[in-house]
From Swiss-Prot:
Active site per database record: 412 (nucleophile), 603 (charge relay system), 645 (charge relay system)
Localization terms from the record: Secreted
Binding site for Ca(2+): 579, 644, 647, 652, 655
NCBIfam families in the cross-refs: lipase_YSIRK_Sa, YSIRK_signal
Additional notes on this entry: The expression of Staphylococcus lipase is negatively regulated by bacteriophage lysogenization (lipase conversion).
GO biological-process terms attached to the record: lipid catabolic process
Organism (species): Staphylococcus aureus
Homology family: Belongs to the AB hydrolase superfamily. Lipase family.
Pfam family, one: YSIRK_signal
Protein name per Swiss-Prot or TrEMBL: Lipase 2
EC number: 3.1.1.3
Amino acid sequence: MLRGQEERKYSIRKYSIGVVSVLAATMFVVSSHEAQASEKTSTNAAAQKETLNQPGEQGNAITSHQMQSGKQLDDMHKENGKSGTVTEGKDTLQSSKHQSTQNSKTIRTQNDNQVKQDSERQGSKQSHQNNATNNTERQNDQVQNTHHAERNGSQSTTSQSNDVDKSQPSIPAQKVIPNHDKAAPTSTTPPSNDKTAPKSTKAQDATTDKHPNQQDTHQPAHQIIDAKQDDTVRQSEQKPQVGDLSKHIDGQNSPEKPTDKNTDNKQLIKDALQAPKTRSTTNAAADAKKVRPLKANQVQPLNKYPVVFVHGFLGLVGDNAPALYPNYWGGNKFKVIEELRKQGYNVHQASVSAFGSNYDRAVELYYYIKGGRVDYGAAHAAKYGHERYGKTYKGIMPNWEPGKKVHLVGHSMGGQTIRLMEEFLRNGNKEEIAYHKAHGGEISPLFTGGHNNMVASITTLATPHNGSQAADKFGNTEAVRKIMFALNRFMGNKYSNIDLGLTQWGFKQLPNESYIDYIKRVSKSKIWTSDDNAAYDLTLDGSAKLNNMTSMNPNITYTTYTGVSSHTGPLGYENPDLGTFFLMATTSRIIGHDAREEWRKNDGVVPVISSLHPSNQPFVNVTNDEPATRRGIWQVKPIIQGWDHVDFIGVDFLDFKRKGAELANFYTGIINDLLRVEATESKGTQLKAS
């Protein structure tokens, strides 16, 4: 009997030790997984979640083993009861409970320490960890009465696992960002605790930066300034270097845009007109409201001041253009005058001499606007030997006087003509005033001066403000001049209705004059040896004289547009780009091989450095995304890459690269700027009145 009881006791101990050994091995495996998860915490965010979930998983594993061991103990208790040894089994169970209670407290303390370490490692995800820890503690509490016996052999193993965790470097402030977050640095709604947020902001700011070649030295939009008060004004009395050109070049804002070949060009033009450009300014919304297409019953034009377009050398417009001569403003790509009028703008194209000097053209422009018979001035006529009076203009604005202004837009030589006319209006012609005092008689109001506030803005397109080597080395040579004057002589026959602009020199056959007599008379004209013509005025010397004659008006907004259609060859010279108008290939190479490197880049006829601004007058660089409303200073727009001299007016019918929609956008943008000039002026008037 006693021997049987001893065997049963031995069996109970054997089973208890076996169960404890199994559970100890299980806890060792679980603790190993827990240590591995701790090592992965500092490098992988996904591993953090696994580490957070492991206490709960550990508890679940313990619970299953504890339930199995509990069942085995119950079976043993039943066997002991049947054999009469229940008392000893209970003693053993109570002893086991006492030990397991102490072990449970120790393990819970260790788990709490481990949770604190995990909480420190998580940083910004502490709240999530606390929730996971609380879940683990609740699971441990549920099984604390059943897993005590099995923990005896696992205490040392758990202690070793905690030692491994403590040996790992603690990184409480480091946050691991998932890869999908880094893939979107410009997200507008990043997490508040994401350290990539500042980078995202910088990335967004970088997208709004201006082109590196665009210098923004302007004052806030719509601010009226005087050139003398502008700290950013730079006098360009020193000749600009080649580096000065690169800062103007606008490669990003090239007008060329990818166009679907199947898209109707007329529809593109219509879209451009229906949705005029809106500049990216703080007042863009208010400005956009001022620019709207013509409504069905609208009679009042959208612009307050008429816009007058002035053609350049060789330009013929309106009824004065031959049948095969292209439409000067826009060609067949975009008929600028016609389309802008359809949109409700008051625009006009002036008709002045195609071969005349800037002086004669400026006088003609005045009478084109004001109306009346052209008076070139007694002093000027006597000095150069041509007739004083010319043709008579009807006038587009007979009441033109100070306070009633116009906008002037000139292409090529037209920009020079505009500047000289405005100078005469404001300061008069000293030679004519002196001649009038000495000889009496009549004097044109244009020459008396004192007519300020009659021009709101001056905009020049590819204008040779500083001249062109093409005129010096080609256009103003004796051979070319003879060809030009011979053409005028031929077109002056009595059967021709085309006026090339030299009638004041006698290039018009009289009604009763034979053609032979007409040829003899014209051959004696002083024009053959005179400098009072376009060929000379476009030279470097002729343009320099004009620059010295003109000054800046602090009440006028000045803007220039420049194109470049040349590239640097292997020897450092400029060659015409492919697609440059074929008639300008020779002149482009003449300019591109100039001895001065800064004078080589060109649009086929005009060097870039000449088109930017007059060399002796103040200027400031502006971007395409800001309103050009400053006064008393040349606002230099970024150079347009790939535009040659005639791309500004669209007459190159062989250039299929330049679309009518481009011209529509270009001229609509100019009109928008002119409307903003008017808005700025009205605002200034209201402020003065208040």
